[in-house]
């Protein structure tokens, strides 16, 4: 999926409002995913996945931090996510069908919390960006 110049502009603009809130946004997106799509929990055995757990918050910060890095390298997400894709494919062995599930929940959280900035065109651009991230993350699977 090709991100247009307008998409890149929209994603960078909304990400200015994400920066500094990576942990809260990430934790809520993960919590919603674990709640609404409970099969995703199987990759986190023995972890405390409750709403206020320190694990959920620290992991959420890492996930959205990685997205902040992808936004900073929006012209070359493949390279920016190369190691992360390897890790999910080779080490964590996460079924790539799960990536769009987290992408969906991140989109929901941004829509709720950044509503004034979440115009139709920003919605479309962020959806395309997260779909690209999910696609790139799945690219090392063979
Ligand atoms: C670890 C990002 C989707 C399962 C990680 C890490 C990052 C990350 C940054 C930490 C890597 C490290 O410490 O070296 C992302 C992004 C995703 C995504 C950006 C999609 C938008 C998923 C999904 C699952 C998953 C959908 C499973 C349902 C895991 C697991 C770990 C991990 C099990 C290891 C957790 C731990 O060490 O405690 N991910 N991830 N990821 N991810 Fe993902």
From Swiss-Prot:
UniProt keyword annotation of Cytoplasm present: no
Pfam families (alphabetical): Globin
Chain ranges of the Globin domain: 2-142
Tissue-by-tissue expression: Red blood cells.
Residues given in the record as heme b binding sites: 88
GO CC list: blood microparticle; haptoglobin-hemoglobin complex; hemoglobin complex
A GO BP annotation: hydrogen peroxide catabolic process
Binding site for O2: 59
Keywords assigned: Heme, Iron, Metal-binding, Oxygen transport, Transport
InterPro entries: Globin, Globin-like_sf, Globin/Proto, Hemoglobin_a-typ, Hemoglobin_oxygen_transport
The keyword Heme belongs to this UniProt entry's keyword annotation: yes
Gene Ontology MF: a single term: oxygen carrier activity
Family statement: Belongs to the globin family.
General function of this protein: Involved in oxygen transport from the lung to the various peripheral tissues.
PANTHER family per record: HEMOGLOBIN FAMILY MEMBER, HEMOGLOBIN SUBUNIT ALPHA
Assembly: Major hemoglobin is a heterotetramer of two alpha-1 chains and two beta-1 chains.
Protein name per Swiss-Prot or TrEMBL: Hemoglobin subunit alpha-1
């Amino acid at each position: 999926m090709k991100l247009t110049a307008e998409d890149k502009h929209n994603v960078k603009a909304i990400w200015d409002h994400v920066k500094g809130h990576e942990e809260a946004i990430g934790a809520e997106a993960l919590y919603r995913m674990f709640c609404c799509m409970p099969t995703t929990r199987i990759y986190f055995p023995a972890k405390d996945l409750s709403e206020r757990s320190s694990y959920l918050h620290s992991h959420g910060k890492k996930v959205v931090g990685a997205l902040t890095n992808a936004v900073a390298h929006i012209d070359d997400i493949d390279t920016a996510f190369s190691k992360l894709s390897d890790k999910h494919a080779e080490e964590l062995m996460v079924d790539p069908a799960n990536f769009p599930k987290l992408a969906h929940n991140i989109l929901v959280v941004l829509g709720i919390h950044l509503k004034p900035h979440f115009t139709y065109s920003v919605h479309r651009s962020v959806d395309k960006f997260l779909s690209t991230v999910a696609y790139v993350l799945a690219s090392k699977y063979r």
